[in-house]
Amino acid sequence: MYDRILVAVDHSEMSDRAVRAARDLAVLSGGEVWVLHLREREMGAKTGVLRIDETTQEASDQVAASVNVLTEAGVKAHGEVRNTIFGYAAREIVNDAIEVDADVIVMGSRGRGDIAGLLLGSTAHKVIHLSDRPVLVVR
């Protein structure tokens, strides 16, 4: 059913839930999981310098922790950290899903950057509209 699952992660509780949902889908279907973490960057107006709120090590550590959750359950997992420009995360997630030929995209309903009161985070909302693949949004 789901041979290839892409799960988008950040440092949020919803992200942890998404990893667990991807794990459960993979265990049920015998699929493998790709864990994608995007580091959003902004261009500085004066200097053109990139500003990123987390270190490469922090991002890599989170991906490694997510991959560990999956492999402990017997799921084959791959992890990747990519940089993207602020506001382009949804496109990157969809493009990565195409690249790995994912059968489904799994992600949290809100990430750490979304306003807590929103029912559906802006990135999840955009992914749903941009993707031609099923999207499982975890709450």
Regions found by a protein language model. Name each.
Residues 135-138:
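Short, flexible loop segments at boundaries between secondary-structure elements
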Residues 104-126:
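Glycine-rich, Arg-bearing micro-motifs that act as flexible, cationic patches
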